[in-house]
Amino acid sequence: MKDMYDVLVIGAGPAGSIAARTAAEKGLDVLLIEKRQEIGDPVRCAEGVNKAYLKKYVEIDKRWICADLSASHIYAPDGTKIEMAEELSGGEVGYVLERKVFDRALAEKAAEAGAEVRVKTRATGLIIEDDFVKGARLMHLGKEYDVRAKIVIGADGVESKVGRWAGIDTSLKPIDIETCAQYLIAGANIDQHHCEFYIGNEIAPCGYIWVFPKGDGKANVGIGVLGSKTGKFKPRPVDYLNKFLENKFPDARIVEMVFGGVPVSGSIEKTSTNGLMLIGDAARQSDPITGGGILNAMNAGKMAGEAAYAAISAGDVSLEKLEEVYEKPWRATLGHDIDMSLIVKNCFINLSDEDLNSLAHSLEKVKFERMSLLDLLQALFKADKKLLWDLRVLFKDAAKEVVKNKT
């Protein structure tokens, strides 16, 4: 490990690895570090991604594909089922990944592009001089190193310390985080061609339960519950998950379990400062509705890698330059989608089970493989006129997209 690089990327998840690869492909000298000894472990998500969007960032490799989904089924509190084609099911439906293999493959691609990759290497603080981030203090195999870099990219996940060290407020309130629990189960009779989502305040308060098949009778079964609905004297997310498992898959065997948190806060005020950018969960760039963050992280990582090249080439890594080449571009694209999702989240967390059932009944007969904006408007108007009004900004935005696509 050298003491000077162009770019230091802290965290080797999808965001960090894509950022490192992108910067290295541009000819920059890059160090990518991961605090754990094994990249991709532990897994902390349902592992589902949209096929078309994934192909934008990486060539598909069957080694890290567990299942190929064609649809999703959403179940209302009363059991009403809504079927949606894969293309309309959002960023988390399409392929089910083996994240332990996938994340490692992304890091390998970064290494092949020229980045240096170091595991069991933890950042313990930033080097800050004259109000500029100049690198980080690292701990590797019991030895401390001061590593300098022209730009530091913080990709250290939901528990990020990098942003806080740099003076960026990444704090989360209980309502801004989903508390999650997930089991990998085996021995269950699970359809391997679609995933399932279960909603309802008795099932997962202000959240949902997911079932993602992983082949050979295995599946990820997990739950996310809004942090404001957990705490002292309240059931834990794992309690809701255990109850669901007992009812839905009584013969299943739990072979692995993971716990964690997912940011659902929407965009934070600031994701860059002099000499530093935040990406992925560290920048709170996950989807506020689903908590899904793989594709958003890869998108942000690519933008950050390109921004690092632009800033270093210009000899200017100031906040003003990083706002120009990273902050403004990501907010105009990815950030816009996150903001729209936050509007939906804030509407739906206030719906009662009766409201959710009414909405499901209105959507039950809709053919989602060819649904139009007008179809959705009519269904929402029938179910809940107030909900339609609350979401009006989304439809105004969607209508603009329809017009743009037709011209």
UniProtKB/Swiss-Prot annotation:
Keywords: FAD, Flavoprotein, Lipid biosynthesis, Lipid metabolism, Oxidoreductase, Phospholipid biosynthesis, Phospholipid metabolism. GO terms for cellular component: membrane. FAD binds at residues 15, 34, 45-46, 48, 99, 123, 281, 293-294. It catalyses: a 2,3-bis-O-phytanyl-sn-glycerol 1-phospholipid + 8 oxidized 2[4Fe-4S]-[ferredoxin] = a 2,3-bis-O-(geranylgeranyl)-sn-glycerol 1-phospholipid + 8 reduced 2[4Fe-4S]-[ferredoxin] + 16 H(+); 2,3-bis-O-(phytanyl)-sn-glycerol 1-phosphate + 8 oxidized 2[4Fe-4S]-[ferredoxin] = 2,3-bis-O-(geranylgeranyl)-sn-glycerol 1-phosphate + 8 reduced 2[4Fe-4S]-[ferredoxin] + 16 H(+); a 2,3-bis-O-phytanyl-sn-glycerol 1-phospholipid + 8 A = a 2,3-bis-O-(geranylgeranyl)-sn-glycerol 1-phospholipid + 8 AH2; CDP-2,3-bis-O-(geranylgeranyl)-sn-glycerol + 8 AH2 = CDP-2,3-bis-O-(phytanyl)-sn-glycerol + 8 A. Gene3D superfamilies: D-Amino Acid Oxidase, subunit A, domain 2 (3.30.9.10), FAD/NAD(P)-binding domain (3.50.50.60). Its cofactor is FAD. Binds 1 FAD per subunit. SUPFAM superfamilies: FAD/NAD(P)-binding domain. The keyword Flavoprotein applies. Its EC number is 1.3.7.11. GO terms for biological process: glycerophospholipid biosynthetic process; membrane lipid biosynthetic process. GO terms for molecular function: FAD binding; geranylgeranyl reductase activity; oxidoreductase activity, acting on the CH-CH group of donors, iron-sulfur protein as acceptor; oxidoreductase activity, acting on the CH-CH group of donors, NAD or NADP as acceptor. InterPro entries: DGGGPL_reductase, FAD-bd, FAD/NAD-bd_sf, Geranylgeranyl_Rdtase_fam, Geranylgeranyl_reductase, GGR_cat. Pathway: Membrane lipid metabolism; glycerophospholipid metabolism. The keyword RNA-binding does not apply. Is involved in the reduction of 2,3-digeranylgeranylglycerophospholipids (unsaturated archaeols) into 2,3-diphytanylglycerophospholipids (saturated archaeols) in the biosynthesis of archaeal membrane lipids. Catalyzes the formation of archaetidic acid (2,3-di-O-phytanyl-sn-glyceryl phosphate) from 2,3-di-O-geranylgeranylglyceryl phosphate (DGGGP) via the hydrogenation of each double bond of the isoprenoid chains. Belongs to the geranylgeranyl reductase family. DGGGPL reductase subfamily. Reduction reaction proceeds via syn addition of hydrogen for double bonds. This is Digeranylgeranylglycerophospholipid reductase. It comes from Methanosarcina barkeri (strain Fusaro / DSM 804).
